[in-house]
Structure formats: structure tokens, C-alpha cells
Amino acid sequence: MNPIVPFVQNLNEKDASAWHEVLQIAMPNVKICKISDLSKHELKSISVAIVANPNPADLLCLPNLKWVQSLWAGVERLLDEISNEEISIVRLIDPQLSKTMAEAVLAWTFYLHRNMPEYAKQQNNKEWLQRDVILASKRTVGILGLGHLGAEAARRLLDNGFKV
């Protein structure tokens, strides 16, 4: 009998199904299932769970849980709400994700910093009115959280002259 690993998530049905399929293909010798599909006996046998934006309370029904593998970068809520030190909570660190997110933060910051919505409006109205230019060094950008994603975004903003 294959070991059972619940996939505990708070995703829309389409995304949950896609993740479930990918996980099952990647681990053919493991039965990936919803936590709601497990019997009381099976719940007691679970030592590993895979999660994606879960409600941490959903994991509390697994009395022998030892390892939680998060497919998402952020695990703060899990750490805050699961106080059992015997459970290892492991998160995904993807350097490419950090770079991609930092590029998006930089792009949107420049979009707003250089007042692109106003210029697009002028373009639609066939107008050209020069706007005041504010230097990046005069603009402060706040980042909520300096984990891997936030730190990379902050570094890119600093490299481009913004105060962070």
C-alpha cells in the first residue's frame, strides 16, 4: 500500500486540481489526497502533508504530523498558528521567483512613479502635457515583509535609486 500524503490547500477548484495532478505524477508511489477524504484511522497515520495556502487549523486534525511542505513561499501564518515544535514547516525558496517578483515590483513602481496612467489618459485624448519629474531618490517605497521576495524587491528598488 502506498503512503498517503494529504494535499491541504485553500485554492480554487481549477488550481487545486492542477496541483493535485502534478503532485500525483511527480510522486507515483504516494497517494495524494484531500484531507477531507481521509478516515479517522488514516488521519492518525499521516506524518507528512503538502500545503498551498492552507488554513492552519486544517492540519491540527493530524496528530502525528512531523513535516509540512509548503508549495508557497510564505509560511508565516503556519508558524504563527501551529505551535508544535515537533512539526517541521518547510517552505519553497525559488531564486527565479524572487527575481521575477522583484522585476514586477520594479516595473509597477516605475509605472506609478513616472505617472504612466496620466500619460495614457493624455494619449487617449491626443494631448501632450509634460508632467513634473520627481527623481527616484526623492521617492520612498514601502515593502511589507523582507523575506526572500521582499528583500530582492527592495534590493532592485535601491539599485534604481529609490528609498526603501
Provide a role label for each language-model segment:
Residues 1-46:
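N-terminal glycine-/charge-rich "phosphate-binding" loop or analogous flexible N-terminal tail
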Residues 2, 86, 137-140:
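Phosphate-coordination loops involved in phosphoryl transfer and adenosine-cofactor binding
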Residues 22, 104, 108, 152-156:
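Rossmann-fold NAD(P)-dependent oxidoreductase module
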Residues 28-35, 48-52, 121-129:
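Short gly/ser/thr-rich secondary-structure transition/capping motifs
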Residues 47-120:
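Phosphate/diphosphate ligand-binding glycine-rich loop within oxidoreductases
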Residues 131-164:
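Rossmann-like dinucleotide/phosphate-binding beta-alpha-beta segment
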